[in-house]
Amino acid sequence: MQYKDENGVNEPSRRRLLKVIGALALAGSCPVAHAQKTQSAPGTLSPDARNEKQPFYGEHQAGILTPQQAAMMLVAFDVLASDKADLERLFRLLTQRFAFLTQGGAAPETPNPRLPPLDSGILGGYIAPDNLTITLSVGHSLFDERFGLAPQMPKKLQKMTRFPNDSLDAALCHGDVLLQICANTQDTVIHALRDIIKHTPDLLSVRWKREGFISDHAARSKGKETPINLLGFKDGTANPDSQNDKLMQKVVWVTADQQEPAWTIGGSYQAVRLIQFRVEFWDRTPLKEQQTIFGRDKQTGAPLGMQHEHDVPDYASDPEGKVIALDSHIRLANPRTAESESSLMLRRGYSYSLGVTNSGQLDMGLLFVCYQHDLEKGFLTVQKRLNGEALEEYVKPIGGGYFFSLPGVKDANDYLGSALLRV
């Protein structure tokens, strides 16, 4: 059946029907259109999530035991401060900016339009906290002759050296200080970085930067779901329970009985590794071989021969590695012996995707971050066990560094690094 339109041209009835539906939708009378209008777009955060916040003051810095947020950035800086007084000014200023940014508030107005705006404006007129955490760590180089801090250097802090499989780029290594910035959304992370750089032009210079992510649903699980890395395997299954305070005192935090400088108590050693994946090569590798390399089922995350992700592998009943290979990643990283208990660490890694390399390969990988009370017993011991593992054929560490995450800020009269600088 056909109708004539207002110009006298024959028009199919289906087209005319669509026009009627469109008119009803504009009038608010179409149930389908109304339903779509009230639905949130996929992946968007509710207002409650944007206003989620982590406490800033406390014995420890946020961003270490905090359940992983979806977006993350690592930024290493060279410190431009000329003396210890300048360094104190830097740490006080960073503390002030962190306190504001993590708790949120109205964006500052610019009183004189002839001057640069006081805020980048990328979050609008209200800066939502968005579950933001900013964790400040210091590198080995901060304890050189510039500030007279050498006697106070954490005992196990050292410059990152090359392991056999490393292909380190000097431009992506080390730093006087490192910021780990995490939030629910990437725009909040970027806003925080720009705010910090704007306020410290004479005190900090960016050395290197990398941005990372985990899946939105893993972040929303608040630590109950293990993130999946870009090799398709769950990453962090064997992490110790971050909600167990007694265990965290043993694994993560520097304590008084370690004979470290007194100011380090409540802080943590941080190892950072930028690891590039050969994803094209990996994607052409048979599933069975992939699972043998990791020692886990790719879909469930369970140790091979077991049913569930968090099942504990029984290496004693598999001494020849017939079920879980002797050189598998999980068996080398954590042999589950009495001796290996001292090398536990808390992993907080993120995936990255950066474009393509000069050779035309996808530049994807892992921003590996871990925290431990002792760098030598933790990351360094584990990495030595992993030297020569089968996974090395598919991964290439290209940067990173070792740092010490400062203890927390007690209250509004305190500042990050105060115990270090008052010595």
UniProtKB/Swiss-Prot annotation:
Which cofactors go with this protein? heme b
Identify the domain of life: Bacteria
Q: Know the name of this protein?
A: Deferrochelatase
Concerning SUPFAM superfamilies, the annotation shows:
Dimeric alpha+beta barrel
Q: Which GO terms describe its molecular function?
A: ferrochelatase activity; heme binding; metal ion binding; peroxidase activity
> What exactly does this protein do?
Involved in the recovery of exogenous heme iron. Extracts iron from heme while preserving the protoporphyrin ring intact.
Q: What GO terms in the biological process aspect are recorded for it? A: iron import into cell
Which keywords appear in this protein's UniProt record, sorted alphabetically? Heme, Iron, Lyase, Metal-binding, Oxidoreductase, Periplasm, Peroxidase, Signal
> What do the Gene Ontology cellular component annotations say?
cytosol; periplasmic space
Q: Which reaction does it catalyse?
A: heme b + 2 H(+) = protoporphyrin IX + Fe(2+)
Q: Where in the cell is it found?
A: Periplasm
PTMs per UniProt: Predicted to be exported by the Tat system. The position of the signal peptide cleavage has not been experimentally proven.
Q: What is its EC number?
A: 4.98.1.1, 1.11.1.-
Q: Which organism is it from?
A: Shigella boydii serotype 4 (strain Sb227)
Co-factor binding comment: Binds 1 heme b (iron(II)-protoporphyrin IX) group non-covalently per subunit.
Pfam families according to UniProt = Dyp_perox_C, Dyp_perox_N
Q: Where is the signal peptide?
A: 1-35
